[in-house]
Amino acid sequence: MRVVRLAVAIITLLAMPACVPLASMNPLWDDAHMISEPALTGSWVSDSGDAILTVAELSGGRYRLTYVADDSASQYEVHTVRLEDQLYLDVYPDSDWIEKRLNGEAFQSLVLTHFFLRVVLEEDRLELAVMDDEALEKKLEQEGLDVPLLSWKDGLLLAASTDQVQKLVVHFADDPEVWGEPEAFHLCRAR
Protein backbone atom coordinates (compact mmCIF):
# COMPACT_ATOMS: atom_id res chain seq x y z
CA MET A 1 0.00 0.00 0.00
CA ARG A 2 2.90 2.35 0.73
CA VAL A 3 4.18 1.89 -2.81
CA VAL A 4 0.76 2.88 -4.19
CA ARG A 5 0.59 6.06 -2.07
CA LEU A 6 4.13 6.96 -3.07
CA ALA A 7 3.34 6.40 -6.74
CA VAL A 8 0.25 8.60 -6.44
CA ALA A 9 2.31 11.41 -4.86
CA ILE A 10 4.96 11.25 -7.56
CA ILE A 11 2.43 10.99 -10.39
CA THR A 12 0.59 14.02 -9.01
CA LEU A 13 3.62 16.25 -9.58
CA LEU A 14 4.57 14.58 -12.81
CA ALA A 15 1.11 15.04 -14.26
CA MET A 16 1.19 18.78 -13.77
CA PRO A 17 -1.36 19.84 -16.29
CA ALA A 18 -2.01 16.71 -18.36
CA CYS A 19 1.04 15.45 -20.15
CA VAL A 20 3.40 12.64 -19.26
CA PRO A 21 6.82 14.12 -18.54
CA LEU A 22 9.83 12.85 -20.40
CA ALA A 23 11.95 10.75 -18.05
CA SER A 24 15.72 10.98 -18.49
CA MET A 25 18.48 8.66 -17.34
CA ASN A 26 20.91 11.58 -17.20
CA PRO A 27 20.58 15.04 -15.68
CA LEU A 28 20.13 18.35 -17.45
CA TRP A 29 22.50 20.08 -15.03
CA ASP A 30 26.26 20.14 -14.96
CA ASP A 31 28.64 22.40 -13.04
CA ALA A 32 28.93 24.84 -15.95
CA HIS A 33 25.16 25.45 -16.20
CA MET A 34 23.92 25.04 -12.63
CA ILE A 35 23.02 28.35 -11.00
CA SER A 36 21.58 29.60 -7.74
CA GLU A 37 18.17 31.25 -8.03
CA PRO A 38 17.21 32.66 -4.59
CA ALA A 39 13.85 33.92 -5.89
CA LEU A 40 12.66 30.28 -6.10
CA THR A 41 12.79 29.73 -2.34
CA GLY A 42 9.55 29.90 -0.43
CA SER A 43 6.06 28.45 -0.57
CA TRP A 44 4.15 28.69 -3.83
CA VAL A 45 0.40 28.08 -4.16
CA SER A 46 -1.05 27.03 -7.50
CA ASP A 47 -3.44 29.51 -9.05
CA SER A 48 -6.10 26.80 -8.85
CA GLY A 49 -5.44 26.56 -5.09
CA ASP A 50 -5.11 22.78 -5.11
CA ALA A 51 -1.32 22.41 -4.86
CA ILE A 52 1.54 23.85 -2.83
CA LEU A 53 5.23 23.82 -3.75
CA THR A 54 7.77 24.51 -1.03
CA VAL A 55 11.29 25.20 -2.25
CA ALA A 56 14.28 25.32 0.14
CA GLU A 57 17.87 25.91 -0.98
CA LEU A 58 20.32 23.18 0.00
CA SER A 59 23.45 24.69 -1.56
CA GLY A 60 24.34 26.79 -4.64
CA GLY A 61 21.88 25.63 -7.26
CA ARG A 62 20.52 22.62 -5.34
CA TYR A 63 17.08 22.77 -3.77
CA ARG A 64 14.61 20.54 -1.97
CA LEU A 65 11.16 20.78 -3.51
CA THR A 66 8.14 19.45 -1.64
CA TYR A 67 4.92 19.17 -3.62
CA VAL A 68 1.61 18.75 -1.77
CA ALA A 69 -1.68 18.09 -3.55
CA ASP A 70 -4.76 15.98 -2.88
CA ASP A 71 -3.64 15.02 0.65
CA SER A 72 -0.38 13.52 -0.57
CA ALA A 73 3.15 14.87 -0.70
CA SER A 74 6.29 14.10 -2.63
CA GLN A 75 9.81 15.40 -2.24
CA TYR A 76 12.49 16.03 -4.85
CA GLU A 77 16.04 17.22 -5.23
CA VAL A 78 16.10 19.99 -7.81
CA HIS A 79 18.95 21.67 -9.67
CA THR A 80 18.44 25.04 -11.33
CA VAL A 81 19.93 25.26 -14.79
CA ARG A 82 20.33 28.19 -17.14
CA LEU A 83 20.75 27.32 -20.80
CA GLU A 84 21.11 30.35 -23.02
CA ASP A 85 18.57 32.77 -21.48
CA GLN A 86 16.08 30.21 -20.20
CA LEU A 87 15.77 28.82 -16.66
CA TYR A 88 14.97 25.12 -16.12
CA LEU A 89 14.59 22.77 -13.20
CA ASP A 90 16.10 19.30 -13.27
CA VAL A 91 13.84 17.35 -10.92
CA TYR A 92 14.95 14.09 -9.34
CA PRO A 93 13.12 12.09 -6.65
CA ASP A 94 14.67 12.51 -3.21
CA SER A 95 16.02 8.99 -2.61
CA ASP A 96 16.14 9.41 1.19
CA TRP A 97 12.49 10.48 1.23
CA ILE A 98 11.46 7.54 -0.97
CA GLU A 99 13.41 5.06 1.14
CA LYS A 100 11.74 6.37 4.32
CA ARG A 101 8.30 6.20 2.71
CA LEU A 102 8.89 2.63 1.59
CA ASN A 103 10.67 1.59 4.79
CA GLY A 104 13.30 -0.02 2.59
CA GLU A 105 10.75 -2.23 0.78
CA ALA A 106 11.75 -2.77 -2.85
CA PHE A 107 13.66 0.51 -2.85
CA GLN A 108 16.67 -0.95 -4.66
CA SER A 109 14.51 -2.12 -7.56
CA LEU A 110 13.26 1.40 -8.33
CA VAL A 111 14.97 3.24 -11.15
CA LEU A 112 14.93 6.94 -10.35
CA THR A 113 14.93 9.29 -13.32
CA HIS A 114 15.17 13.00 -13.97
CA PHE A 115 12.47 15.14 -15.54
CA PHE A 116 12.65 18.73 -16.64
CA LEU A 117 10.57 21.84 -16.08
CA ARG A 118 10.82 25.06 -18.05
CA VAL A 119 10.56 27.99 -15.65
CA VAL A 120 9.16 31.48 -15.95
CA LEU A 121 9.85 33.39 -12.73
CA GLU A 122 8.60 36.96 -12.45
CA GLU A 123 8.52 38.53 -8.99
CA ASP A 124 5.84 36.60 -7.05
CA ARG A 125 4.71 34.44 -9.99
CA LEU A 126 6.12 31.08 -11.05
CA GLU A 127 5.13 29.10 -14.14
CA LEU A 128 6.32 25.53 -14.63
CA ALA A 129 5.93 23.59 -17.87
CA VAL A 130 6.76 19.88 -18.17
CA MET A 131 8.57 18.44 -21.19
CA ASP A 132 5.95 16.12 -22.72
CA ASP A 133 7.27 12.75 -23.90
CA GLU A 134 4.75 12.09 -26.71
CA ALA A 135 4.96 15.63 -28.08
CA LEU A 136 8.74 15.42 -28.08
CA GLU A 137 8.70 12.06 -29.84
CA LYS A 138 6.47 13.50 -32.60
CA LYS A 139 8.73 16.53 -33.02
CA LEU A 140 11.83 14.34 -33.22
CA GLU A 141 10.20 12.24 -35.95
CA GLN A 142 9.04 15.34 -37.86
CA GLU A 143 12.49 16.91 -37.76
CA GLY A 144 14.38 13.66 -38.33
CA LEU A 145 16.49 14.15 -35.20
CA ASP A 146 18.31 11.10 -33.87
CA VAL A 147 17.98 11.13 -30.09
CA PRO A 148 18.26 7.95 -28.00
CA LEU A 149 14.77 7.22 -26.64
CA LEU A 150 13.66 3.96 -25.07
CA SER A 151 9.98 2.98 -25.04
CA TRP A 152 8.40 1.26 -22.08
CA LYS A 153 4.80 0.70 -21.01
CA ASP A 154 4.52 3.99 -19.10
CA GLY A 155 6.17 6.28 -21.61
CA LEU A 156 9.58 7.13 -22.98
CA LEU A 157 13.00 7.24 -21.39
CA LEU A 158 15.64 9.61 -22.72
CA ALA A 159 18.97 7.79 -22.84
CA ALA A 160 21.09 10.73 -24.03
CA SER A 161 24.20 12.12 -22.33
CA THR A 162 23.91 15.33 -20.31
CA ASP A 163 25.43 17.29 -23.20
CA GLN A 164 22.89 15.81 -25.63
CA VAL A 165 20.05 16.48 -23.17
CA GLN A 166 21.08 20.13 -22.94
CA LYS A 167 21.19 20.48 -26.73
CA LEU A 168 17.76 18.86 -27.01
CA VAL A 169 16.24 21.17 -24.39
CA VAL A 170 17.74 24.27 -26.04
CA HIS A 171 16.52 23.11 -29.47
CA PHE A 172 12.92 22.92 -28.21
CA ALA A 173 13.14 25.73 -25.64
CA ASP A 174 10.39 27.83 -27.20
CA ASP A 175 8.14 25.06 -28.51
CA PRO A 176 4.84 25.18 -26.57
CA GLU A 177 3.81 21.73 -27.84
CA VAL A 178 6.90 20.07 -26.39
CA TRP A 179 6.54 21.87 -23.05
CA GLY A 180 2.79 21.74 -22.71
CA GLU A 181 0.58 24.10 -20.76
CA PRO A 182 2.40 25.63 -17.78
CA GLU A 183 1.00 25.45 -14.27
CA ALA A 184 1.05 28.82 -12.53
CA PHE A 185 1.88 29.45 -8.87
CA HIS A 186 2.04 32.57 -6.73
CA LEU A 187 4.36 33.16 -3.81
CA CYS A 188 2.66 32.83 -0.44
CA ARG A 189 3.82 35.64 1.83
CA ALA A 190 3.58 35.52 5.63
CA ARG A 191 1.33 38.20 7.07
Positions of PLM-derived features:
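Calycin-type beta-barrel ligand-binding domains and close structural analogs
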Residues: 20-38, 47-52, 56-191
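Bacterial N-terminal signal peptides that target proteins for export
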Residues: 1-7
